[in-house]
Amino acid sequence: MMMDILMYLFETYVHSDADLQVDQDQLEDELLRAGFHQKDIYKALHWLEELAALQQTDAQTAIAKSAPTSMRIYAPEEIERLDLESRGFLLFLEHINVLTPETREMVIDRVMGLETDEFELDDLKWIILMVLFNVPGNENAYTVMEELLYSKEQGILH
């Protein structure tokens, strides 16, 4: 599954501070040896390329100019993918300044870019972490999100 590959890559190369300059062919071979399917590997790598490309788009400029009181209205397909709990979590993260409108839109874009029928709040948290890691200047937000993710996994968050 694509989400499993993304989490594997994030934990292996990003969270462990491993060498991020990995040859794509070597990476594909490693993922195949780890038991992932070629089709899913290509989808995951394409998803990551699209995440990197989001930083170069002009769409973020329009979002940055929106009024602070603006409210995000979700499209029907977004509502189908992001349940009420997930949408509430995104709103919560905006209120505590972990997400900006720009990073929220990047998260939603990448959530919609996943080819999966099953999507849960924990998956959303991983996507948020990946987006924050990939956008320069979000180190504090990344740290807060990482604490939210890992403290929940360890049963500390109340």
Swiss-Prot record:
Chain segments annotated as transmembrane: none
Similarity section: Belongs to the Smg family.
Entry protein name: Protein Smg homolog
